[in-house]
Amino acid sequence: MNKVEFSHVTLAYGGNTIVRDFCLTVAQGEIVGIVGPSGCGKTTIVRALCGLKNPESGEIFVDGKPYYSRAKHVNVSPENRNIGIVFQDYAVWPHLSVSENVGYPLKKKKLPKDEIARQVHEALGQVSMLGYEKYMPSQLSGGQQQRVAIARALTSSKDLVIMDEPITNLDAKLREGMLVEIRLMQQRLGTTIIYITHDQEAALQLCDRVVILNQAGDICQIGTDEQIIEAPADKFVFRFIGVSNFMPVIEKNGKYYLHLDEDVLYADDTPKGWIDGPAEMGIRPMDMIFDDHGLTEGELTQAVFLGDMYNYFVRIGGREFRLQRSTLDSLDGREYKAGDRVRLRLVNEKYYPTEVKN
């Protein structure tokens, strides 16, 4: 069953189109991430879902019911859309206690006090905040304040929650833990979550599917984490998801070269995925592998230890490229240092037509 449907939604500010012909269905109980660079329209899309921004055209449905349709003159008011929202900056009211913050949506609905207390207790239990009912926000850490914000969203709606950059303001360790907590909570409750972020790693870790938007607000790809990483739809997606190396490539007399300041051999038979015509290769740093029998030669210019991996920078054909090697792989006894001549084997590369500049 589809929980949310955007049908050909176009959004604009002052005549400037931000999102054009946006179509997306979100299933009941699914976590869908909307990911893209700053200014691509991610937040505008969920503002439209919440009733805070009217589309120029298109329709929005929740549980099969129209929430917005300009053609049919339907526009359900924000307070009647029954959607929970979690913002980046916690947005807990500093003058209200934890229980008052969480119970505020229920108070607005004029529920009986005992029912409010019951639902507040239940929501705080879902986010491991029981015992903090009388605390003020100033007495809480950033992670605890965000848990309060999530609990408040649950009292607004356990069925559908929007999370807009909910972990951006937390430190790295708290971010990791909060993602796990959000997933466990969602599994317990069956909540449908639309997760807005520019953090690709967080979206891929948390979400069942991810929607990739480009700078123009167009959908480039919708897929699982594996689909997006293993089969990026285009060059933008490849570049946007993780670190990448890009370089022009050519074929000459049945051999394949990196077309740099000088041509550098990398394959002596047709590579998988090769396309005819001017092309560029995209390759991840982990897929450029040190191999004494590799066809590609370069000079190691820098080795940087990052704890769980090494970053290596290798100059090939006049340009510098990044390689990555896990610390475990580096336990083979082979040490690589600046100034070494190295040979490489390239795997899992992707090919894209060269963009023509007007």
Regions found by a protein language model. Give the residues of each.
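Non-catalytic connector elements of ABC transporters
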Residues: 244, 255-358
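Conserved ABC transporter NBD signature motif
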Residues: 58-70
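The feature captures the beta-strand-to-loop junction immediately N-terminal to the Walker
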Residues: 35-37
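ABC ATPase nucleotide-binding domains
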Residues: 82-84, 88, 95-236
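ABC ATPase nucleotide-binding domain helices that frame the ATP-binding cleft
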Residues: 43-46, 148
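Helix-to-loop junction immediately C-terminal to a conserved catalytic motif
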Residues: 50
